[in-house]
A protein has these predicted regions:
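Selective transmembrane-helix segments that form parts of the transport pathway or gating/packing helices
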Residues: 117-144
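Hydrophobic alpha-helical transmembrane segments of multi-pass membrane transport/permease proteins
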Residues: 47-68, 83-86, 195-206, 234-241
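Aromatic- and glycine-rich beta-strand/loop motifs that create alpha-glucan
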Residues: 4-50
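Long, hydrophobic alpha-helical segments
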Residues: 78-94, 98
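Junction motif at the cytosolic side of a transmembrane helix
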Residues: 2-9, 13-16, 235-252
């Protein structure tokens, strides 16, 4: 036996009487790292979700550019276009979040593993958050190029990034819960928007309301603090709900 095997055994010592040893519980942090590495590695080796979401976002913005028939948009119209586009792009990522695990048996294997089920929730939510952020790196510049007039200042972009990150956290948590439910049904592509959109309405409203003054031509007031606080509260509440409910959802 190698030194590393002696230092890091995977099972406990055999019990007296020849009973089979009980597997050691994998620490939550180690399980999250392994699952997240697998999640991001799969997307890097064979990109599927991020390119599809990014292409959908850019295509939708191009459609808005020609449909609105104006050189630029501002205020609530600009905010609405941005957040509706990002929301529906997120539906693509949510609907595919658990599909590979379900079809290839990875989900069943995880349920048999000696680790906390919360590890899968955290890894999937962080992975979806990363996918959303990657899409926005493409979608937001495309939005500015196609639909905004003069480029906003650095301060405006910084405040917009803060809103995007808070909204992405809420979408990631809700998306992980809904994805875990939908993957067990045949009509998952229908179930995801029907269940996720009502739950994400507060995210869209708060994000659009916070973005409106940032994209208003004559506004110099900046981002109202109440909207980021509302998003943070939403993230906290649904994060706790996800922590409490995920075990039951994934096992059923």
């Amino acid at each position: 036996m190698s030194a590393s095997a002696r230092e890091h055994p995977t099972t406990a010592e055999p019990a007296p009487g020849g009973a089979p040893p009980e597997p050691r519980l994998v620490p939550l942090r180690a399980a999250v790292r392994a699952l997240l590495r697998k999640e991001l590695g799969l997307e890097l080796r064979a990109p599927q979700a991020v390119p599809a979401m990014a292409l959908f976002s850019v295509t939708t913005l191009v459609v808005f550019h020609f449909a609105l028939q104006r050189g630029q948009v501002e205020g609530d119209l600009a905010a609405g276009v941005l957040w509706v586009t990002l929301l529906f792009a997120a539906m693509l990522g949510i609907s595919r979040l658990f599909v590979a695990d379900h079809e290839e048996g990875g989900l069943d294997g995880f349920l048999l593993a000696p680790t906390d089920r919360t590890a899968l929730l955290v890894a999937k939510a962080v992975g979806l958050f990363a996918f959303l952020a990657a899409v926005e790196v493409v979608a937001v510049p495309a939005f500015a190029l196609l639909l905004l007039g003069p480029a906003p200042g650095i301060g405006t972009y910084a405040q917009l990034v803060a809103l995007l990150l808070l909204a992405d956290a809420g979408i990631a948590v809700i998306g992980t819960l809904i994805g875990a439910i939908a993957v067990q049904t045949r009509a998952r592509d229908l179930i995801v928007p029907l269940m996720a959109l009502p739950l994400l309405i507060p995210v869209v409203i708060a994000s659009a309301k916070g973005t409106t003054p940032l994209l208003a031509e004559a506004s110099g007031s900046g981002l109202p603090l109440r909207w980021p606080l509302l998003l943070a509260l939403y993230d906290l509440i649904f994060g706790l709900l996800a922590y409490a409910l995920f075990d039951y959802l994934i096992e059923d």
